[in-house]
């Protein structure tokens, strides 16, 4: 959100990818700044030693700034208001590459907003077809909480779950990767009410003996 807010283009890369895939994404997008953890940053430094970076778990070096140091700074800088057109690029997502090299798909500001509206429209349709059950859920004292169990570099994780929950101020719990025991623990302890994922994930959850408890 902060990246887009200053008029830049966000490029979520496959953090599980190998060095070659990261290199392709950085080169194709002509990235000028990278946010990464130490594991990914070690790959990136082998490819581009001088690319400016900010890291959550690395110290300061010639071209890397620790995020902790940025957050500790006493001086607050007001974000510059940048005029953007609705058709200006906002996010560059990469395909999975199952049929060849991953390909970049540019999403404009309008595309992103329309995608969020589509999710809300589907939600409204779901409510209208299941009003009695949905009203029971809405009457629950437990507020809506979502478990994010898919990657943010995938469109369903970023737009359909992360940004839609941010838009409505709902709690979002993020998993590093899918693990059935960890998912059940989070659902139980945090009283999660929403989980969206691949069919195999949902089936694994429903078949687990702990889920009924």
Kindly give the residue locations of the regions a language model identified.
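Conserved AMP-binding/adenylation subdomain of ANL enzymes
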Residues: 113-145, 153-194, 208
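Conserved AMP-binding A3 loop
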Residues: 90-129
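ATP-dependent adenylate-forming carboxylate-activation enzymes
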Residues: 8-27, 38-40, 170-190, 199-201
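Conserved pre-ATP/AMP-binding loop-to-beta segment of ANL
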Residues: 75-94, 100-101, 131, 136-145
């Amino acid at each position: 959100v902060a990246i887009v807010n200053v008029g830049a283009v966000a490029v979520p890369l496959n953090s599980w990818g190998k060095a070659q895939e990261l290199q392709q994404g950085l080169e194709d997008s002509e990235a000028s700044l990278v946010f990464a953890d130490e594991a990914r940053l070690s790959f990136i430094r082998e490819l581009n030693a001088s690319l400016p970076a900010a890291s959550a778990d690395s110290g300061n070096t010639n071209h890397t700034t620790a995020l902790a140091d940025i957050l500790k700074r006493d001086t607050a800088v007001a974000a510059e208001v940048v005029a953007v057109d609705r058709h200006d690029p906002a996010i560059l997502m990469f395909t999975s590459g199952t049929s060849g090299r991953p390909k970049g798909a540019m999403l404009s500001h309008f595309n992103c907003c329309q995608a969020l509206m589509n999710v809300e429209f589907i939600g409204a349709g779901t409510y209208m077809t299941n009003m009695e059950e949905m009203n029971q859920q809405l009457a629950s004292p437990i507020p809506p909480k979502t478990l994010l169990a898919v990657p943010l570099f995938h469109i369903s994780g970023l737009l359909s779950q992360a940004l839609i929950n941010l838009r409505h101020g709902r709690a979002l719990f993020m998993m590093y990767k899918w693990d059935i025991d960890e998912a059940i623990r989070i659902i139980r302890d945090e009283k999660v009410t929403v989980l969206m994922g691949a069919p195999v994930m949902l089936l694994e959850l429903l078949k687990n003996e702990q889920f009924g408890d």
